[in-house]
Amino acid sequence: IANLPSTVEINANHWTSGDPYSHDIVGHIRGGIKPEQLDGFLDSTGIKYDKNRINGKLLLEWQNASKVDVRAIIAIAMWESSLGTAGVATSPGANMFGFGAFDSNPDNAKNFNDAKAVVELAKQTLLANKNRTFKRQDDKAFANAHGGLDTATEGGVYFTSTSGTGKKRANTMALIDAYIDANGGADDHLTDIGDTPSDAKATESLTSNIPMVKATVPT
């Protein structure tokens, strides 16, 4: 993202493992983050996003419902769809997180709006398929590309790219964290909120037979 710095100082207290790349993004959040801080970060990206579709208030609601760290939610939305401004995410009814946008059928993302998608992303992609850190997502994509991923025991991949997709998302989380520190701060420790997505309203009327992860044959 052109408008953001390439590196920032990492505060180990803000991550389960001491760093964003290995941070467990489900169930562990930095408390005290304010909607206005998230709005400020979104504005700082220079992306011309829809402020009614994604904003600090909604992001914190999605964190509460999905149990996914809000810093990770933003990072995913930025790299999947430039905050809803690119790809299938611009279609009516589709989501900005790439959920349901299978390589073979990207239009399937239209079955999940943003609120539904972030909860199902947590349930299916991150939890059921054991993709709780961005490092693990990268490691599994690499193993998948080289025929070494046992999906029966390790779960499916989140993405198939081996270009460091997870590391890019982790770096974005670090930028978000640093922006918060520079603009009022938040808790200097993590809070465990459990890892059971809880928003029944967000998950109603979901199609039960949607495949859990993207699946493509490596080239």
Task: Report the location of each language-model feature.
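Conserved beta-strand/loop element in small beta-rich adapter and peptidoglycan-binding domains
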Residues: 208-219
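Catalytic cores of secreted/periplasmic lytic hydrolases that degrade extracellular macromolecules
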Residues: 1-72, 82-209
